[in-house]
């Protein structure tokens, strides 16, 4: 192979020969003697040994063995995971006078470096032509010369790193798919002329960006090549020590960089340097890898704020803290625990929701470093924590305890209360006797979230509570006003009566305002009941907080079980009317109760004139009676016993012996309400006066009732079985009705079995007229059927016999 003479290694060419070349404007002078306008460059010829190559000894030493690596993956998920530490190989070239025998071109990693000979030992100069002269050294193969100026500046040396099996030394190039390499990154390195840690000039091959895709145990085969002309000569190969490639979960972490790597980084080589070992923490989703490098190295990277770990800022402490507040600001009394803490000053419910969701409790104690407090205050807390007047209203509950956690930020309705005292100078209130020590924090959060997270116009926004003190006695019970909120009990107000119930309901979540007058406050219609007798226990008028209290300024929706006539039975019972004024033809007076329902569909003018129909008068009187029979509750054993002797087991029509036992009629009945007594008119205010006058927004608006059903016309009980009863029902539907009674209740108001609302609700004259019409229609049916038996006639006469003869004709209207 022919090469230029300047590139040959013949002895005829002097070792120090150099060719001086200048630009076009210069002369053949040295750079120091050139003119000012000329720039001279000196080119040194690269000398290679094309002959006597069997006299050259290549020594390869692995200065940094690879120990571990993290697999980088395949495809789009692949990333850079370099081998730790980066493999570094040192090269030394020694020439000998005689050819050396290298049976195996692949050497081991541990080769004894050449030793310099003392002066006078061995040959002073190589005797073989073409052998480089230099510093005399001694190696395992004999005496030789090492010319560093020759091979350290040779750019034709390079090294290739390939992956091999750790046990079989099998070379691994491609994966099973046949197109993906085992390694990723740069697997080729040129020769770097660098200083060693002792300051000597040496040649190194460095692989700082070599990654492996698959987990396993491998070796690196490092092959040295030299390019000569248009060909490449393989010089020598070396194997590294075995190392393991881990998965992301099993990777132990990056180790601290060695002194050699740090020295190379200081000289400008692109090597990642870690000053401290990066060990993987348990439970961490991120692995400590080479991406977090030092800022002092050339490959240092700024860590992204999004990828910053809490361990870089927070101290490693195991003290649990729910909120980052100092110990001096912890709540010191039971009442202070339910106030908003002084670091929480945001009244907006939306912001409190996001703060709670986005800021979980910290695991570190905030008093260990001041930087933690600054970070926490800049993230979520209001810096105006020194304002003494920022006091929040707290909502206490009877079952709160001392060892509860701090409530969440959105446990109140976010309103300020004007307070003239700092939150930490108050005296601790005495614990209430009604507090339950077993109540958990979940009950409190459920109570306050469902009750107080609304704008209630009844509760004052700026009402400042009385300041509590240990020396002051508890406040006396108010005479005309009862605290409308359960939180006032914890501030010194006495508890209400024993019938006090929680102000929480799934139907009406707000708190009703109690009546200040001694007269009982009219209540809303009864709620929807699941049993027919559940309304008996709800007639108590001594309750202050109603479970089904009305929501202020909200129109109540229509309910199928609601009857407008229930409003008459909610008030107090007036004195019994005179016997002579029970006639429907007597003079009418305004009613004593102010109606909150809509006008009757049949006669709208009755409510403006103060008129009440006979059905409403009897219904109201019967519902206020303490006797079950007067309220229309039949006795099932007596009602269904002896059907053969009583053809009307469920419709007694006022006869004591027909459908109910006589014992229920021996007790005195409650006097009906005097619906015709003069009244002063509706009260002026909502809570003032005797009656109850709701605003127009609270009037119950009911939809129009459908057409009455034949099965429920003029009464609410179920139709008895039997042919006679069905015929009697048809005759009852055909009879004329009083128009004052309005529309009869429809099928939606059918009461359950055993409940008879018509018992005692009609006037005596109305019942007599009903009996008369029923008897006439029964006679017509009997004539059409034929003669009846004497027993049937006797039973029918006894059951339908009125108490006194009727004073009206057969077809006489009202």
Swiss-Prot record:
Disruption phenotype: Leads to reduced virulence. It is found in: Nucleus. Keywords: Nucleus, Sporulation, Transcription, Transcription regulation, Virulence. GO terms for cellular component: nucleus. Residues 7-18, 800-814 have a biased composition (Polar residues). A motif (Nuclear localization signal) lies at residues 438-445. Residues 1-36, 96-134, 267-333, 407-441, 457-501, 539-814 are annotated as: Disordered. Residues 271-285 have a biased composition (Basic residues). Residues 620-631 have a biased composition (Low complexity). Component of the velB-VosA heterodimeric complex that plays a dual role in activating genes associated with spore maturation and repressing certain development-associated genes. The complex binds DNA through the DNA-binding domain of vosA that recognizes an 11-nucleotide consensus sequence 5'-CTGGCCGCGGC-3' consisting of two motifs in the promoters of key developmental regulatory genes. Required for gall induction and teliospore formation on seedlings. The N-terminal velvet domain contains a NF-kappa-B-like fold and is involved in DNA-binding. This is Spore development regulator umv1. It comes from Mycosarcoma maydis (Corn smut fungus). The gene is umv1.
């Amino acid at each position: 192979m022919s090469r230029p003479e300047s590139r040959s290694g013949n002895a005829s060419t002097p070792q120090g020969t150099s060719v001086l070349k200048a630009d076009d404007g210069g002369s053949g002078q040295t750079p120091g003697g050139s003119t000012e306008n000329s720039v001279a460059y000196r080119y040194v010829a690269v000398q290679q040994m094309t002959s006597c190559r069997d006299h050259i000894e290549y020594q390869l030493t692995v200065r940094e063995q690879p120990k571990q690596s993290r697999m980088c993956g395949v495809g789009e998920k692949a990333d850079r995971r370099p081998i730790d530490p980066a493999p570094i190989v040192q090269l030394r070239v020694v020439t000998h006078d005689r050819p050396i025998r290298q049976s195996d071109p692949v050497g081991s990693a541990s080769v004894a470096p050449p030793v310099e000979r003392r002066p006078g030992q061995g040959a002073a100069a190589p005797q073989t032509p073409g052998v480089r002269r230099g510093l005399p050294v001694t190696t395992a193969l004999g005496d030789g010369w090492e010319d560093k100026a020759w091979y350290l500046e040779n750019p034709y040396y390079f090294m290739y790193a390939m992956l091999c099996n750790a046990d079989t030394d099998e070379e691994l190039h491609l994966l099973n798919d046949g197109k993906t390499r085992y390694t990723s990154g740069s697997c080729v390195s040129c020769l770097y002329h660098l200083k060693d840690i002792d300051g000597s000039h040496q040649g190194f091959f460095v692989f700082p960006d070599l990654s492996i895709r698959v987990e396993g145990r491998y070796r690196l085969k490092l092959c040295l090549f030299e390019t000569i002309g248009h060909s490449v000569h393989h010089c020598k190969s070396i194997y590294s020590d075995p190392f393991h490639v881990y998965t992301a979960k099993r990777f132990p972490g990056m180790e601290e960089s060695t002194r050699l790597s740090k020295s190379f980084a200081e000289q400008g080589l692109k090597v990642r340097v870690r000053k401290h070992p990066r060990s993987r923490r348990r439970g961490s989703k991120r692995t400590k890898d080479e991406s977090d490098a030092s800022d002092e190295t050339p490959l240092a990277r700024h860590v992204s704020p999004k990828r910053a770990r809490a361990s870089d800022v927070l101290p490693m402490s195991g003290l649990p803290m729910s909120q980052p507040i100092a110990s001096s600001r912890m709540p010191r009394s039971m009442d202070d625990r339910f106030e908003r803490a002084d670091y929480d000053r945001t009244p907006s419910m939306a912001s409190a929701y996001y703060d709670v969701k986005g800021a979980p409790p910290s695991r570190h104690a905030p008093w260990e470093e001041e930087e933690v407090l600054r970070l926490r205050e800049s993230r979520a807390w209001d810096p105006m924590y020194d304002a003494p007047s920022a006091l929040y209203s707290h909502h206490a509950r009877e079952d709160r305890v001392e060892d509860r956690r701090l409530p969440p930020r959105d446990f109140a309705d976010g309103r300020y209360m004007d307070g003239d005292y700092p939150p930490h100078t108050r005296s601790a209130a005495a614990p209430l006797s009604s507090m339950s020590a077993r109540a958990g924090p979940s009950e409190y959060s459920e109570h306050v979230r469902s009750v107080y997270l609304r704008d209630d116009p009844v509760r004052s926004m700026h009402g400042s509570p009385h300041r509590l003190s240990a020396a002051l006695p508890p406040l006396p019970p108010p005479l005309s006003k009862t605290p409308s909120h359960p939180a006032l009990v914890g501030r010194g107000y006495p508890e209400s009566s024993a019938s006090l119930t929680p102000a929480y309901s799934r139907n009406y979540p707000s708190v009703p305002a109690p009546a200040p007058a001694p007269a009982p406050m009219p209540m809303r219609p009864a709620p929807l009941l699941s049993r027919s007798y559940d309304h008996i226990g709800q007639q108590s008028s001594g309750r202050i907080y109603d479970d089904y209290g009305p929501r202020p300024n909200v129109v109540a929706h229509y309910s199928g079980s609601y009857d407008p006539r229930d409003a008459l039975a909610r008030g107090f019972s007036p004195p019994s009317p005179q016997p002579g004024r029970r006639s429907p033809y007597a003079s009418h007076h305004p009613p004593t109760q102010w109606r909150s329902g809509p006008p009757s569909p049949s006669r709208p003018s009755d409510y403006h004139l103060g008129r009440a129909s006979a059905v409403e008068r009897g219904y109201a009187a019967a519902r206020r009676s303490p006797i079950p029979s007067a309220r229309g509750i039949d006795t099932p054993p007596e009602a269904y016993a002896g059907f053969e002797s009583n053809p009307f087991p469920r419709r007694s029509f006022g006869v004591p012996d027909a459908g109910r036992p006589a014992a229920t009629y021996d007790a005195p009945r409650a006097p009906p309400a005097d619906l015709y007594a003069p009244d002063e008119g509706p009260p002026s205010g909502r809570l003032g006066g005797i009656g109850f006058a709701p605003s127009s927004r609270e009037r119950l608006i009911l939809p129009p009732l459908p057409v009455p059903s034949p099965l429920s016309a003029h009464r609410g009980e179920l139709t008895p079985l039997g042919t006679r009863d069905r015929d009697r029902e048809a005759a009852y539907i055909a009879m004329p009705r009083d128009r004052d009674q309005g529309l009869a209740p429809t099928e939606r108001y059918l009461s359950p079995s055993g409940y008879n609302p018509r018992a005692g609700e009609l006037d005596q004259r109305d019942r007599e007229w009903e009996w008369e019409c029923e008897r006439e229609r029964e006679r017509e049916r009997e004539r059409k059927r034929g003669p009846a038996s004497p027993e049937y006639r006797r039973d029918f006469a006894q059951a339908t016999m009125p108490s006194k003869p009727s004073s009206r004709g057969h077809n006489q209207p009202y």
